[in-house]
């Protein structure tokens, strides 16, 4: 789409956040090229949705003037990590054409257990999971991330909604 709207798909935050707009242009040509690059699944092009907070909240810090075209490709929540890893490998060919690919979202992101009174402090399991994930990514060791269910309690708590029981 030529002019994606800013989507505020969240709740429970200060009103100022809902007023943020990120008027970056879209690029139907890059969207079509992305669609044609992906062979492992069918990719639909949407003319309605726009850029949700998983996209604009990151890109607005990299390009505050909203002067680069942005397209958003959402994850398929019905598919597992291996599927998305393979999808990302397909997308990597776009980098050779000068297209920046950003995977956004927090590695440890569970607002259901956030302690709003102590926002500067993390849970031990969250710190452990975050540190381990960063180290694996830095080392290029993606197999444990794909097989996150085998990585111990810290990953279990994160990936399964921060269960508070053993």
Explain the meaning of each model-derived region.
Residues 9-16, 63-72, 146:
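Short, basic/glycine-rich phosphate-binding loops at helix/coil junctions
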Residues 33, 87-91, 107:
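Short, hydrophobic/aromatic alpha-helical segments in well-folded domains
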Residues 70, 76, 84-102:
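Active-site regions of metal-assisted phosphoester/phosphodiester hydrolases
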Residues 49, 104-107:
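Short, well-ordered beta-to-alpha junction loops that form the rim of enzyme active sites
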Residues 31-85:
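Internal, conserved structured core segments that host functional sites
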Residues 17-25, 74-81, 158:
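Flexible, glycine/proline-enriched loop segments at strand-loop-helix junctions
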Residues 1-45:
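A short aromatic-anchored loop/beta-hairpin motif
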Residues 68, 79, 93-99, 107-166:
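Surface-exposed, charge/polar-rich loops and edge strands
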């Amino acid at each position: 789409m030529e002019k994606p709207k800013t989507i505020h798909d969240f709740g429970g935050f200060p009103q100022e956040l809902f007023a943020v707009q990120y008027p970056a242009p879209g690029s139907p040509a890059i969207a079509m090229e992305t669609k044609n690059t992906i062979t492992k699944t069918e990719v639909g092009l949407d003319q309605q949705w726009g850029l949700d907070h998983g996209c604009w909240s990151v890109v607005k810090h990299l390009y505050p003037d909203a002067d680069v075209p942005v397209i958003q490709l959402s994850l398929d929540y019905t598919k597992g990590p291996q599927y998305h890893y393979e999808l990302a490998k397909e997308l990597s060919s776009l980098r050779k054409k000068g297209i920046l690919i950003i995977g956004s979202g927090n590695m440890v992101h569970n607002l259901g257990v956030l302690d709003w009174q102590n926002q500067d402090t993390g849970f031990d399991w969250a710190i452990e999971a975050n540190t381990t994930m960063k180290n694996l990514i830095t080392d290029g060791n993606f197999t444990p991330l794909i097989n996150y269910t085998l990585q111990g309690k810290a990953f279990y708590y994160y990936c399964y909604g921060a269960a508070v029981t053993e």
